């Protein structure tokens, strides 16, 4: 959302093609189309099942991607499309807009597929879905005008495992704002909690692909210390 607002403030006409919310909607029914803060939003209704199981996620992925495919001409009306790596088949559709309409393609890599699925033993290497993902990677990275990686480590992995050009891959950390300097300590809402303490913060995902053993080890080693605060949105 910050990216969308920044593009709008820079003078671009911005639209968002996204899924219709199932559990995050507040206040009841959400319109399928609306103009919010100068941004045209088109929400697509699709089959949404439970997200906890593998089969449910696959149904959600394919259903949403299919409905985006039906709106491919809408994507083609824009000069550029910014597409994220999740669901993993979605960038393939965006790459077709590049081929059919000449729409510039910006691919934002949150996750690397099929590696995420194979490392977590969700999929077997060489399976039909893995081969499909590898084909999608070839199409997307061949057609992308720009690729955004979340870290230098991810960029190095992309350059090592994908047919990507170094100059086209840019590192933009997530949830980062260049506000030009440090904030005033008096404006820190946690100033009383952190006063006189050395604070180490971890702001990141806590999932199957993260090294949680280090964090859990610190919790166990320092469990008697009254100096730890863990907050999360489980």
Positions of predicted regions on the chain:
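N-terminal subdomain of nucleotide-sugar transferases
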Residues: 1-37, 219-222
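A short helix/loop element that forms part of the nucleotide-sugar donor recognition site in Leloir-type
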Residues: 29-33, 177, 181-195, 199
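Acceptor-binding helix/loop patch of EC 2.4 sugar-transfer enzymes
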Residues: 46-56, 101-135, 184
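An aromatic- and histidine-rich active-site surface loop
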Residues: 61-67, 73, 78-116
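Membrane-proximal helix-turn-helix segments that form the acceptor-binding/catalytic region
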Residues: 89-92, 96-101, 127-147
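Carbohydrate-associated surface elements
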Residues: 153, 175
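Conserved donor-binding/catalytic core segment of Leloir-type glycosyltransferases
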Residues: 189-210, 216-219
């Amino acid at each position: 959302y910050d990216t969308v607002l920044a593009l709008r403030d820079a003078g671009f006409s911005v639209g968002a093609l996204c899924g219709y919310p199932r559990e995050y909607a507040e206040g009841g029914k959400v319109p399928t189309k609306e103009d919010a803060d100068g941004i045209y939003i088109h929400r697509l209704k699709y089959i949404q099942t439970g997200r906890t199981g593998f089969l449910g996620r696959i149904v959600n992925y394919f259903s949403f991607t299919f409905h985006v495919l039906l709106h491919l001409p809408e994507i083609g009306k824009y000069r550029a499309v910014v597409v994220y790596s999740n669901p993993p088949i979605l960038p393939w559709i965006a790459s077709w807009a590049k081929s059919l309409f000449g729409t510039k393609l910006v691919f934002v890599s949150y996750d690397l597929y099929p590696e995420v699925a194979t490392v977590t033993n969700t999929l077997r290497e060489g399976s039909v879905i893995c081969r499909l993902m590898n084909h999608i990677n070839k199409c997307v990275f061949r057609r992308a005008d720009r690729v955004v990686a979340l870290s230098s480590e991810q960029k190095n992995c992309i350059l090592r495992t994908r047919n990507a050009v170094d100059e086209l891959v840019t590192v933009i950390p997530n949830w980062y704002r260049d506000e030009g300097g440090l904030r005033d300590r008096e404006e820190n809402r946690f100033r009383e909690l952190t006063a006189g303490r050395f604070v180490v913060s971890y702001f990141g995902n806590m999932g199957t692909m993260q090294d949680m053993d280090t964090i859990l080890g610190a919790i166990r080693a320092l469990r008697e210390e009254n100096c730890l605060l863990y907050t999360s949105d489980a």
